[in-house]
């Protein structure tokens, strides 16, 4: 099972593609760093902020779930499997951040009985962090 979250980054992609041609086609170094940013922010959402990438707080767990947890963890944290499964992969042309847990799609998208609790995606802070990273990286190429 795989979850895909897409964003229109066409302006950034066009600039990166032009630059990529000058760099023999590989953007793996900055894409690996972007993956690290996204992995960290995704983990922070699960472990700390309990918010979607757009900043909206997740719904509380149901009373039945709270009782079943018996004080263990919080929203999306019971044994830590989802949190531990967040990874990223970078190549010369792309970066993927996500979870290999089969149930992650139900958490991200919700079900008839479970509210959505989006954890994958880019927040406004992620965009800013990526912009800062790319500015620094490009400046390093010029200097």
Would you name each region that the model predicts?
Residues 1-143:
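Short, Lys/Arg-rich flexible segments
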